[in-house]
UniProtKB/Swiss-Prot annotation:
The keyword tRNA processing does not apply. Residues 78-96 have a biased composition (Basic and acidic residues). Directs RNA polymerase II nuclear import. Keywords: Cytoplasm, Nucleus, Protein transport, Transport. Residues 232-255 have a biased composition (Acidic residues). The keyword Protein transport applies. This is Probable RNA polymerase II nuclear localization protein SLC7A6OS. Its main location: cytoplasm. It is found in: Cytoplasm; Nucleus. InterPro entries: SLC7A6OS (IPR040218), TF_Iwr1_dom (IPR013883). GO terms for biological process: developmental process; protein transport.
Amino acid sequence: MEAAVLRVKRKRGADPADALILSCKRIRTEDETKESSAVTTQVFRLAATVKSENEPLHKYVREAISRNQSCLTLRPSSESKQRIQEELRASKEAERQVSRYRIISSHRPNSEEDNVGASHLIGCSSQDVPSETQDEAEATEATKSHISSPFQLFDMVQEEPEQKYLEKDSEPETILCNSIKMIREHLTVSEAGQESEHREYVDEYVYDIYYSEASQHGWIQDILYVQPYTEEQELVSEEPEPEEIYEDEDDENEENNWRNDYPDEEDSDREERYIGYYEDGDEEEKSAGHAWKMYHRSSLREIGDDDENADLY
């Protein structure tokens, strides 16, 4: 099959996810055993964000596939698929309250008969399924022009978190300056300004286009859940990068530290020889000076004795 596409409708002020993980049931083939997993996960990467749902998706999807080499790090390795699936199942209930994706329509390529409206919350029971909404009607009209597209298309809506998760403390923390309580009204002026500034586009919607390359398991059906892909360790290289060591950070007690380098034995022997030579030279100079003084004194004595004898005669 060709690439599958998720078109997610979200408010302009919300942040899009870099990637989505879609989990769905997989149809077993005759060659597969019963022990093989009946659930498969697929990663959808963010290709582009468009302002209108009527914009053609072909160019964005094909451009994203052409630069797929720079996005390969978003694909989870085969060893980590099982771990990701278990972690997502464990935290599915909590994450669902934070970010919910509701499917409003599903369209297979080049087949109008197979197009199905899927108005339900992913992972919820049939009691939570709402009736047809305005989003479904808009998506149905918008996807009529994409029925002949060469990829499977799912229209979704990113719903906002529940209000109980967004509630803040009724009494904000007191701000003190030099033990004096500050007036909070001066701080809320800027917040009001920001709210009025963003009021123009807070209710506007944009559409995030996510794509996934051809799947080996056929069409995507029986979707279990769609969650943001948040495994940060899968998005970076597992090889640690060498850290820079600065001179003021190295340990002087380490054996390989440059400050602890000792001179070679040959240099030490040569130093000792020259030190002995200089010491011997100093002793010889001292002895020669002492002998000269003794000779000088004896000479003076002899001269003095000769002068005394001359006076006697």
